[in-house]
Regions:
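Macrodomain-like recognition of ADP-ribose-binding/processing modules
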Residues: 1-193
Length: 193
C-alpha cells in the first residue's frame, strides 16, 4: 500500500469531530499530521490508528536519506583540538531523525511530552513527531503528570526512528540573559547523558 493511504487513515482519526478536510497532496497531509501530533492530547489511541501511523512512518523512512552514526567524524578527526572528550563528541548538521545509531539525545521539556507548540524544525518536536504517537503516549504513561528537573534524563525506545533508543534530557529553559546557573545546568545536562 501507498504511504498516503496509511496517513489518510491516521488523519481521519485525528480530525474526528472537526470541520477540517484532509488535503489531497501528500506534502500537505504530512504538514497537517505534523501539526496535529505535536498538539496531540488524546489517550487510548486505537491500535489500528497507531499501526497505520507506524506503517506510514516506516514507508516514509524508506524514502529518506539515512546517515550512519558510526561514520560521523568526531571533533578530533575534523579539527586540531584539545577539547576534553573530543574523541567522543561529533558535530553534525542535518535531520537527527535520519541518523542510524544506537541512541539519539533529545533536549526536551520537563513533562517529557515534547514541544507542544507545533513549531516545525525544533529538535524535540522532530524527534517526537517522527518516532510516532507511541512515544508521547509512552512518556505520558511514565510521567503520570509529574515533571523532571533540569539535567534529569529519561530513556525510551525510539519507535519509528532508525535508532534504537532516545535519551531525553531536560535542559535549562533560557529566557533572556544566560546566567551562571544556566551554564552549570547545561553542563550537567551534557554530563548526565
Amino acid at each position: 500500500m501507498d504511504k498516503k493511504v496509511y496517513l489518510d487513515k491516521v488523519l481521519k482519526y485525528l480530525l474526528e469531530g472537526t470541520d477540517v478536510d484532509i488535503p489531497s497532496s501528500i506534502k500537505d497531509m504530512i504538514d497537517l499530521w505534523e501539526e496535529l501530533v505535536a498538539k496531540l492530547d488524546k489517550d487510548n489511541i486505537p491500535s489500528d490508528v497507531l499501526s497505520n501511523e507506524d506503517k506510514f512512518l516506516r514507508l516514509d523512512l524508506l524514502n529518506r536519506k539515512l546517515t550512519d552514526g558510526e561514520k560521523i567524524k568526531t571533533i578530533s578527526e575534523t579539527l586540531d583540538s584539545d577539547i576534553d572528550y573530543c574523541t567522543k563528541i561529533a558535530l553534525w548538521k542535518g535531520d537527527i531523525t535520519t541518523i542510524y545509531a544506537d541512541v539519539l539525545v533529545n533536549s526536551t521539556t520537563k513533562d517529557m511530552l515534547g514541544c507542544r507548540e507545533g513549531i516545525k524544525g525544533t529538535l524535540d518536536n522532530s524527534i517526537f513527531t517522527r518516532s510516532g504517537m507511541r512515544l508521547r503516549l509512552k512518556c505520558r504513561d511514565i510521567m503520570q503528570g509529574e515533571e523532571l528537573n533540569n539535567t534529569e534524563i529519561l530513556v525510551t525506545r525510539a519507535y519509528n526512528l532508525p535508532s534504537d533508543f532516545i535519551i531525553h534530557v531536560v535542559v535549562p529553559c533560557i529566557d533572556g540573559d544566560i546566567t551562571e546557573e544556566n551554564k552549570v545546568e547545561l553542563k550537567m545536562s551534557y554530563l548526565n547523558v
